[in-house]
Structure formats: structure tokens, C-alpha cells
Amino acid sequence: DALPILLRVGKRDYRKEDGIHVQTIRDQIIEVDKSGRVVDVWDLTKILDPMRDALLGALDAGAVCVNVDLAHAGQQAKLEPDTPYGDALGVGAGRNWAHVNSIAFDAKDDAIIISSRHQGVVKIGRDKQVKWILAPSKGWNKALASKLLKPVDDKGNALKCDENGKCENTDFDFTYTQHTAWLSSKGTLTIFDNGDGRGLEQPALPTMKYSRFVEYKIDEKKGTVQQIWEYGKERGYDFYSPITSVIEYQKDRDTMFGFGGSINLFDVGQPTIGKINEIDYKTKEVKVEINVLSDKPNQTHYRALLVHPRQMFK
């Protein structure tokens, strides 16, 4: 069967509970048919909690997706209660509280998996009920907190993680400001973990930041999540891509394809690097590494995708 056509959009003239009409920002998912008719809607302002600010208040004010502000790079974002409506960090419908940047479809139960840059990774059913949430536990209301996946090790033992997502005696880590939360051909979840706001804070030095390609195994019946593969942490700040980016598992080659789209973004005068990688899944050997340079300093690349012409045109 053909996959549904799913789009992330904002909604014009959205009426809030206080009667104010706003234009929402990246917090609506719609399904359209081939004629473009809307056949279903996931309104995240009702499904999630648009007032949760646990990660929003820990972000680097220098870059939020393609909005780059070098004057505030390295500074922790400040959330103001009277932030104007529009494409700005803030809570509530009409501000950039969710920032959905990918949608995956899980055919086995007719559900979607969204990457919400400012909240976490969330699976939602056709009935608009949250199935699970992959994110640190801080700030979720009682109903949504019950949907949080519990981190475990390879033997199924619970890991000890605090509300900010910091876990003891383990390589497990949550994703922060992530992109492309996609299902692999193995049924696992692969994510580009950008890593801004890691541990719901800004580090003492900006150069302590890092990004990862990461893979999780989720047991929906038990409500657990196990980290089974990662790459990039060991490469440190030189591999750090604060915004955009993508990874995708390649079954035919048993490799992880990845693209860090914003390396060196905050380095004044330096070209921003878009780093294309193919990493051997078993050995983590770098099979391919290509640096794509931007023609303008401090401007980001967005994504790189693998194209299979024979499949496209057959």
C-alpha cells in the first residue's frame, strides 16, 4: 500500500482558549490525498503541552533552525512571558514551542512518529493519543509523563536518569534538538542528535558540545528504550552540528548515512561545513566523508539525501 502523504504545517487564524487568533508555528501535522485534500489533522497544541519549556529555556540563543543570530551565539535562551507571537522561541500556540522537523509513519499500527526539536520524539496514533515519548522527564504534565519511555540497558535493567536526562554509569543519552527521527528497515529508531541544550543546560564552554548519529530499540509493550548504537560523540566539537542535519540507515550496505549540515556555524568568517558521512555499522569505520562548504559564512545547509535513480524511475 502507498504511504500516506504527511506534511508539517502551521495553522492560520488559530483561535486560542483566550479568544486570541494566532498563526501557529510548525505544530500541525496534516495528511493529504493525491488531489491535495486534507483528510486528517494532528493538532499538537491539543495532543502535547505547548506550555512545556524544559528544553526551550536551555537552548543556544544563537541558532534556532535556520534563524541564525551570531550576536547571541553561546548564550542561553531567555523565555519572556510577553514574547510576541510569531517564529520566535516561546510557549503556547502562536510561538515556536514545538518545531516539528520530521515525520515517520509506522504502518504496523497506523501511527506517526514526530521529531519535535523543542520537546522530544513522540509517537501518536490515528486516534490522536500519545503512544510514547522519548525525552527527559522534566516538565511534562501528569498525563504525558505516563507516556515517557524508560531507559534500560541491554539486559532490560532500568537505568538511573535524572529529570534533565543525565544518566549514571551508562552510554545511554537522550537526544536534544534532534532531527530525522526515522524508522529503520530493522524496526529501530534512528535519529540525528544535534545536541544543543544537552542535559537541559548550556555547557561551561561552547566547545564542549557534540552531535551524534544514534539508534534506539523501543519495546512499546514494556514502555522501554535501549540505545543500541551511536557515532560522533568521540569526534567532539569538530563534528557538532547545532541545527538541521539527517541520518538514515542503509540496509543494502549495512551503513549509517549522515549529514551534519551546520558544522562551524558559529565560527566567524569560516565557511559552514555540511559533512556527508557513510559509517560502517559494525566497525564504525568512516567509509565516506565529504565536506560541502557553503558560499556564505554562518549560513547553514539543510539536508542531504541519498537518491536511487533506478528505484525512482522504474
PLM features per residue range, with description:
Residues 4-314:
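Histidine-/acidic-rich catalytic cores in large beta-rich domains
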